[in-house]
Design a protein with these regions (language model features):
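C-terminal helix-rich "cap/oligomerization" subdomain common to oxidoreductases
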Residues: 128-169
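Short, mixed charged/polar active-site loops
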Residues: 58-60, 85, 165
């Protein structure tokens, strides 16, 4: 690790995009970072992060990222509101789960890498982009969505460095 990529810009940014899809515009970001890897710390970045987001209606969502998960590519998002719960869960090769006094969750590891997890999503995104181009319509997500995700990443970086929530309202 020679240069910090900043976990919030290179990993969490995708979760910010998904959270905005679920929650709408975010008005507050509170982030925490920690290090298990000394090289990443020395480069000025975190290798693990927790981010709490709040929208204008007061709905709160939590994102947890870690550059290395021994169980595979672990990514979850859950938003609970008065009318229900929306989840984005891990994709597994099997639905068999094991739970006992020592172990819980899936009997098999999670998919190993984001390219495995999102292969279909990337293909569908490219198809939708080409379709929008051919039809002369505005693609989604838009450049405005990308800018908002980056704005959240910058707010999370500031929050993790200062230890304080950042207001975006």
């Amino acid at each position: 690790v020679k240069v910090a990529c900043v976990i919030f810009r290179d990993m969490t940014i995708h979760d910010f995009d998904m959270a905005r899809f679920f929650l709408g515009d975010i008005v507050e970001v509170h982030a925490f970072g920690q290090n298990f890897n000394e090289e990443i710390r020395e480069a000025g970045d975190f290798d693990a992060a927790v981010v709490t987001l709040k929208n204008a209606a007061g709905v709160v969502a939590t994102i947890v990222n870690n550059r290395k998960c021994s169980a595979g590519y672990d990514q979850l998002l859950e938003a609970q509101v008065s009318t229900g719960t929306r989840n984005a869960d891990n994709i597994r090769d099997t639905t068999v789960r094991l739970s006992n006094a020592e172990v819980t969750d899936a009997a098999e590891p999670y998919l190993d890498f984001f390219l495995q997890r999102y292969a279909d999503a990337y293909r569908l995104e490219l198809t939708a982009f080409i379709d929008a181009f051919v039809a002369g319509t505005k693609p989604t997500p838009s450049i405005d969505d990308a800018i908002e995700a980056l704005r959240l990443a910058e707010a999370a970086t500031e929050s993790a460095k200062t230890g304080k929530p950042v207001s975006l309202a």
